[in-house]
A protein has these predicted regions:
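N-terminal accessory regions of nucleic-acid-interacting proteins
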Residues: 81-172, 366
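Conserved RNase H-like, two-metal-ion catalytic cores of nucleic-acid enzymes
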Residues: 2-64, 152-239, 253
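Low-complexity, acidic/Ser/Thr- and charged residue-rich accessory regions of DNA metabolism proteins
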Residues: 167, 182, 701-778
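Catalytic nucleotidyl-transfer cores of nucleotide-processing enzymes
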Residues: 139-142, 289, 296, 399-522, ...
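Short glycine-rich phosphate-binding loop at a beta-alpha junction
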Residues: 236-243, 561, 569
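Common nucleic-acid-contacting/processivity interface regions adjacent to the catalytic cores
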Residues: 2, 16, 127, 132-140, ...
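C-terminal polymerase-core module
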Residues: 571-732
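Active-site-proximal helix-loop-helix substrate-binding element of RNase H-like nuclease domains
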Residues: 210-213, 234, 238, 248-251, ...
Length: 778
């Protein structure tokens, strides 16, 4: 019997006494299925030393069995950095014993190394048969005697071979669920040891939303209610925002303490912590959108509301601060808190729905399941992709080792032409570093010791790379670049707003992420194919390319105002820009495209800091405090408005007037308190700091009062009129009234510096805004 299904998730389980892979999928008629493949035997490789007799090694292993799990041995030809070698392929009846078995073999046989013994059984299965999540497959098999109701599926199949990919583009209609929990404490942050969950708000893709609440000082009803939501609606994808760091750990601890079963997986099991710190729900994809926000570099303060605003999806702003939850829950205004949490669950759902296509495309490309791919650092995404591709090329997959990295010179950044400039175009090289690695065959397996007839020498650093045959990086990057270009072409031909267009744009973005990250992967400490020479050579070629491009632009009469890594900012002249693009292709063999066009742009003296006004009137701010997370909203708003005014007017008059008027409003307490809050992130536990910084002191105060503050938390504080040093004047934002605010501090240390960083380009310094008494000149 043939079965076609779309793969959502997979895991390693025992089935009838054998190791098996369980594949969770959806059929073309929207049925949920569990496909069991018990036909894969785990193995690892042994690489003999030069001169060792491989046949004798094989006989010895078969005779002496260095580890009892070894079942059989075969000799194969594989590649080690493109060089063909004979290896021993050792099959084991116990997947969990691979590493021990390999260690004993290396010890007893004295071979050079073992390979692929540290890879998980499920990952080896994916690599062996090229199984990627979020793709359609076909398999032959029979219906299993396993009761499908036990696993919340419509049918269970046992297959005779292995799944094979079939060309089918779109994912099936998935069932989506979002949720958010509330736990409250009368003193500080809630603790799962002490404080029960009082409320769960949820929304699903059928359009239903509600809450589960508990009046008791216990949360058995809440945990049981959340379990029933998962069992009844049976979601494929579960969205949260911070679920991996807060919701799931809290729920699991509460379930254990109350001895209440948390049944959220398709196996009716709990959430289980897995790779990359994420929590796995068997047969479902647990997608934490806080991880997704990590890919949105322009969103500095990671809240679901900020992410929703960036994506342009609907979200409500919370009116009730977390510090006020207890008062609302125990007082007469509980309904407002319940309403806010329902709105938050809806916001999480909207963000998740918008992010889903990108998540599925990134999962398919990297081969990491949807619940892992966002939690994984970009290096691990590339790692997973490269393992799959290396196996197809017959390469042995080396173990990942943490290395001591030797720093190397990075990308070139030009000195900006300070001041205002009209009609400025940004010219972006398309995948410049990957393209250079392809062009010059830069790869760990093409690196050679000396120059030769068929060898390329990298300028400046002097490393040598073989021109032929293509290396690992050239092969995989060529495929990625071609795939991205194909998605881009198809998207251009597809009507905007259609489902197909959105999927193609998501595929293009996912491919771009993996392509650009591959260059950095070469110099990443956790890389399986680490090579400082590769990373250093790619950076050197990038610098050489930018310098040649600048010379070419100047020869055409095109004025270059700034350059950063793989982009040039030029005075826009349509004819000259068009000619320049053609000359780059002709002379350098690279693609450069017209990117952003600014009506007017302001460059400061610092590199990587500028702001531009676009044709639609939108302000684009890069590298300045306006988009950083360590100033108050007041300072960011001041700088944004000053930038907007000087860019609109091409002079500082109106901007300076705006600053003086704002200072009057501040001194009259006419600004909202939230705009005065300064947020800083803890990089250590509060007790580990040796300095007395304001956010550290506030964190210590909060900890003493029962609030949970730890590494990675953002601490919000306001500077008050209290005497003492700055750190002594800082108080938690929720404990400060407007009468306690030190307005002089905000004038002299927030408004004036934020404005002066822009206005100093026009010769207006802080001293021109501040009088001799230390107060601002009005």
């Amino acid at each position: 019997m043939r079965l076609d299904f779309w793969l959502l998730d997979l895991n390693h389980e025992a089935h009838e006494g054998k190791s098996a892979i369980w594949l969770w999928g959806v059929t073309h008629d929207n049925k949920r299925v569990l496909v069991i493949d018990a036909n894969f035997q785990a193995y690892f490789y042994l690489l003999p030393k030069r001169g060792q007799d491989i046949d004798r090694l094989k006989e010895k292993i078969e005779r002496e069995k260095p580890h009892p799990s070894i079942e059989r041995v075969v000799i194969e030809k594989k590649k080690r950095l493109a060089k063909e070698r004979e290896v021993l392929k050792i099959f084991s009846r116990e997947p969990d014993s691979l590493e021990k078995s390999a260690r004993e073999c290396v010890k007893q046989l004295g071979v050079e190394a073992s390979f692929e013994d540290k890879l998980r059984y499920s990952i080896k299965y994916q690599i062996e048969f090229e199984i990627r999540p979020c793709q359609w497959y076909s398999a032959e098999g029979t219906e299993s005697s396993v009761d499908p109701r036990k696993y919340h599926v419509d049918k269970v199949f046992e297959i005779s071979g292995h799944p094979t990919a079939i060309p089918r583009e779109n994912a099936p209609k998935l069932r989506l669920l979002s949720f958010s929990i509330v736990a409250i404490s009368p003193t500080g942050s809630p603790s799962p040891i002490r404080d029960p969950v009082r409320l769960v708000a949820w929304k699903n893709s059928d359009g239903h939303s509600s809450t589960v609440q508990s009046e008791k000082n216990s949360d058995e009803e809440i945990i049981d209610g959340l379990s029933k939501i998962h069992q009844k609606f049976d979601p494929d994808v579960v969205f949260s925002f911070g679920g991996n760091t807060f919701d799931w750990p809290y729920l699991i601890k509460r379930a254990n303490l109350t001895k209440t079963k948390l049944s959220v997986g398709r196996d009716d099991g709990p959430a289980r912590q897995s790779l990359y710190g994420h929590f796995s729900l068997t047969g479902r994809a647990n997608v934490d959108l806080l991880d997704f926000s990590g890919d949105l570099y322009d969103v500095k303060i990671k809240t679901v509301e900020n992410v929703a605003k960036f994506l342009g999806v609907e979200a409500s702003n919370p009116a009730i601060d977390e510090t006020e939850y207890y008062a609302h829950w125990t007082g007469n205004d509980r309904s407002a808190l319940v309403g806010q949490m329902k709105a938050q669950a809806a916001s999480v759902f909207n963000v998740g729905e918008d992010a889903l296509d990108y998540t599925l495309q990134l999962s398919n490309l990297s081969a990491l399941p949807p619940d892992q791919v966002l939690a994984a650092a970009v290096g691990f995404r590339v790692d997973s992709y490269l393992m799959m591709e290396a196996h197809k090329l017959g390469e042995l997959i080396p173990a990942r080792e943490e290395l001591n990295i030797v720093p190397y010179k990075g990308a070139i950044v030009l000195e900006p032409s300070v001041g205002l400039h009209d009609r400025v175009a940004v010219l972006d090289f398309s995948a410049m570093y990957p393209s250079l690695m392809v062009k010059y065959n830069i790869s760990p397996d093409t690196l050679v010791d000396s120059a030769g007839e068929d060898v390329f020498e990298v300028p400046e650093v002097g490393h040598h790379f073989r021109k032929n045959p293509p290396g690992l990086y050239k092969i995989v990057l060529s495929q990625l670049i071609a795939s991205r270009q194909a998605a881009k072409r198809e998207a251009a031909k597809t009507p905007r707003g259609t489902r197909e267009h959105k999927i193609l744009k998501a595929r293009e973005k996912a491919t771009k992420v993996i392509t650009n990250a591959t260059y950095g992967y070469a110099g990443w400490a956790g890389s399986r194919w680490y090579s400082r020479e590769v990373a250093e050579s790619a950076a050197a070629l990038g610098r050489d390319t930018i310098n040649k491009s600048i010379d070419l632009a100047k020869s055409l009469g095109l004025k270059v105002l700034y350059g950063d890594t793989d982009s040039l900012f030029v005075e826009y002249n349509e004819k000259l820009v068009s000619q320049f693009i053609k000359e780059i292709d002709k002379n350098l063999g690279l693609e450069i495209n017209l990117g952003q066009l600014y009506t007017r742009i302001l460059f400061t003296e610092a590199k990587k800091k500028y702001a531009g006004l676009m044709d639609d009137g939108e302000l684009d701010v890069v590298g300045m405090e306006a988009i950083r997370g360590d100033w108050s909203n007041l300072a960011r708003n001041v700088q944004n408005e000053v930038l907007r005014l000087v860019l609109e007017d091409a002079n500082p008059t109106r901007a300076k007037s705006y600053v003086t008027n704002l200072i009057k409003d501040l001194e009259s307490a006419k600004v909202p308190k939230p705009s005065l809050v300064i947020w800083k992130t803890l990089t250590k536990r509060p007790d580990e700091y040796e300095v007395n910084a304001p956010h550290v002191e506030v964190a210590r105060k909060m900890a003493k009062e029962g609030w949970s503050v730890s590494v990675g938390d953002k601490v919000g504080f306001i500077i008050t009129k209290k005497p003492g040093k700055l750190y002594q004047k800082a108080e938690p934002h929720f404990k400060v009234s407007m009468e306690q605010v030190d307005y002089d501090y905000y004038v002299n240390n927030q408004i004036v510096p934020a404005a002066a960083r822009v206005l100093e380009v026009f010769g207006i310094a802080e001293k021109d805004l501040v009088g001799t008494s230390g107060q601002v000149s009005l």
